[in-house]
Amino acid sequence: MEKLHQCYWKSGEPQSDDIEASRMKRAAAKHLIERYYHQLTEGCGNEACTNEFCASCPTFLRMDNNAAAIKALELYKINAKLCDPHPSKKGASSAYLENSKGAPNNSCSEIKMNKKGARIDFKDVTYLTEEKVYEILELCREREDYSPLIRVIGRVFSSAEALVQSFRKVKQHTKEELKSLQAKDEDKDEDEKEKAACSAAAMEEDSEASSSRIGDSSQGDNNLQKLGPDDVSVDIDAIRRVYTRLLSNEKIETAFLNALVYLSPNVECDLTYHNVYSRDPNYLNLFIIVMENRNLHSPEYLEMALPLFCKAMSKLPLAAQGKLIRLWSKYNADQIRRMMETFQQLITYKVISNEFNSRNLVNDDDAIVAASKCLKMVYYANVVGGEVDTNHNEEDDEEPIPESSELTLQELLGEERRNKKGPRVDPLETELGVKTLDCRKPLIPFEEFINEPLNEVLEMDKDYTFFKVETENKFSFMTCPFILNAVTKNLGLYYDNRIRMYSERRITVLYSLVQGQQLNPYLRLKVRRDHIIDDALVRLEMIAMENPADLKKQLYVEFEGEQGVDEGGVSKEFFQLVVEEIFNPDIGMFTYDESTKLFWFNPSSFETEGQFTLIGIVLGLAIYNNCILDVHFPMVVYRKLMGKKGTFRDLGDSHPVLYQSLKDLLEYEGNVEDDMMITFQISQTDLFGNPMMYDLKENGDKIPITNENRKEFVNLYSDYILNKSVEKQFKAFRRGFHMVTNESPLKYLFRPEEIELLICGSRNLDFQALEETTEYDGGYTRDSVLIREFWEIVHSFTDEQKRLFLQFTTGTDRAPVGGLGKLKMIIAKNGPDTERLPTSHTCFNVLLLPEYSSKEKLKERLLKAITYAKGFGML
């Protein structure tokens, strides 16, 4: 009813007394609403204020202008408490109210700064530009009061709409124009459009029209730079300059911090429920702007602001992540490292400030999960921005491995087969068209992305379960393998292999029940020690042809005429003997380079493809059964196994002499054709030392190598040596390897250098670490006299004797992934003083040591045992 009596009677003629009374009521109401609005947006100035509806109250949650206007109306209706202006702010408050009283309805939100007669309507700033920031900063310096700038930053950086419009690219400035951006703009237009108003009606109009007003901001589209599909509209250099100027002021930095706390939940909501990126790709700007804040890793951000921002950023759709990654890939190494360290700092802080265990999983910590997802974007930016080779893929001409004729356990139970399409591929790799394997040299080393504190608290059995189930509400760190060390990933692979073995065993039992015939639940190999290659080759070839799925069963080896039961130790010796036999230079399957101590495929080998397939199967089985092999391949072999062809740079590892010669050719400054007189025809020798000529191009003997085509010659030569000359042998080798590992997450989790570590173990033998982790049983302790003497003897061994000792106790002379400290050896007492030699259970890394009467006898018996240890018997 009140609205009916505001101005006129029904007759249309104003009654002077009522009009005056109505005007005074409206003025009083307007004045009170303005005070509430001022209190909500600027506060009373008292830092110890306890009024929950005052911006100066420490517990007050900041809000934007529109929300403050609505709240001011509500407070006016309930006659809420109003603060008295604090002495430190009394002048400013009085001026604010005074301006409000005298201002017209559409401009009551103005703040006037009259030091030099300049007037800036800071409340009309709906977005920021570099010029605007410097202008406000200059005026604040003149007044020695930075609170207006702090409020502007708080308002813009807490609003997604405002931040998206800020720091837009414009047409290219000249150097003189860039310098003038930092100077005070004396001729600034005083008639800018006003965004906020203090009256209730104006504020409500603001609320309805804010989005359209931002879209029609004074940064006209005709002044914006035209952008490509992968370009962004934000001026990153301008943002960096602004941050450099502002972050040195502690109070201004606090404004950024508080704004981020308010901004992040709203952004998360926009991305989760409103599909905002598909409607406005420029929404990505706010993530770019925030990530340029070089103080994000500081302790103040780690508690709340950065975790909230990470949660919001992790909600970006795949297309937005891809665009952000492509942008970041253009950054230099220092900028990538800064962003990487920001997320690593948050993960480490959250890990060490909580107690994680099997009941309180690190996978359930939202901040760590979100930070890991954000770190993944930085990781792929590091990959894409490095030296990338997306060509030279072995997989392009790879023959598919036939599927097993047997049904899987899932199919037997009426479910669709899982992993039918092979191992998983990261969606980001598909989006970017780049794999980690394609990166020859990242911007910063891959090792810097590993977070050791996280690896220490990660319950890998639980994480693997989440990895396989792929539920939305459970995160697996195996989807971010870059953050895991080789030991943790190896454990995940171990679980995958074991579960696959048990699955094959259950399938066998089901088949036995259904078909009524006894099938072997193991991959059983019975071999003669002196005919190991022939026996193993025949058996494995039959399995590979009849049912390749049997290769995924648990390996069980028997040596004919020996009593050893294979709990792992017999398999280790089987692998060792096979490797020794196959890599014997007399057989001629591989050539040996004395300078590098490495083997390479013999292009002239007379051996059948089946034997190369066997080597591939053996390597796959070694990984599958968690055994270490003493093989010495160059790194290019593991790259080729993972799907990449060898290139010129790989020759440096596999054929260093040839690599240096070709490198000298590329760097030669003279006339190559006249001085070297070489053609596209090369010469090689066969097994008997006879020369063989090969044309790298058609009629290669007639094509001279010149300064212009020498690069082509080097590439063709490298391709011939590493790929074409050994194509038949390597295809068979790779096929055997993939028969065992084709459904494994091996390729998803590991890089080529880590595959080498899995197969060959560590070459660094740290016996001090072995001593620290060894356990004792049967009466021995760490402080037993014989144990102390034992370690003195072992530490005095030569390197060769140490390898023999490892071979005797563990079945291999190499350290496992993670070093000898991960071996968990046990030394147990095996009776009193005796003439018997020490014995071992290589399956369980147990050394059985009698209590010898003297140190000399202990050394003599131990050396004899490790020197003449061959074969297996039953104790």
Swiss-Prot record:
Consequence when changing residue 260 to H: In AS; uncertain significance
SMART domains in alphabetical order: HECTc
Basic and acidic residues composition bias: residue spans: 175-186
Composition bias, Polar residues: 213-225
Nucleus is among the record's keywords: yes
Effect noted on mutating residue 850 to L: In AS; uncertain significance
Protein EC: 2.3.2.26
Record flagged with keyword Amino-acid biosynthesis: no
Additional information: A cysteine residue is required for ubiquitin-thioester formation.
Protein name per its UniProtKB record: Ubiquitin-protein ligase E3A
